[in-house]
Amino acid sequence: MPGIRVKENEPFEVAIRRFKRTIEKTGVLTELRSREFYEKPTAERKRKLAAAVKRNHKRLRSQMLPPKLY
């Protein structure tokens, strides 16, 4: 669990912002959301495969040449 030390004379809002940044970097919230409900191993594999296919299509679209307009 990430934590921060509040510095002397540091505003509360700044400390909260630093804490949120460390939480975001470590990925605690995304893991918490994924573990909120049980997901069957087959459903997890299916979701990961669909995400990989989507990433692949996105990568291929960016590599394609633009159509000629003349």
Swiss-Prot record:
InterPro entries: Ribosomal_bS21 (IPR001911), Ribosomal_bS21_CS (IPR018278), Ribosomal_bS21_sf (IPR038380). One of its GO terms (cellular component) is ribosome. Keywords: Ribonucleoprotein, Ribosomal protein. GO terms for biological process: translation. GO terms for molecular function: structural constituent of ribosome. Belongs to the bacterial ribosomal protein bS21 family. NCBIfam families: S21p (TIGR00030). This is Small ribosomal subunit protein bS21.
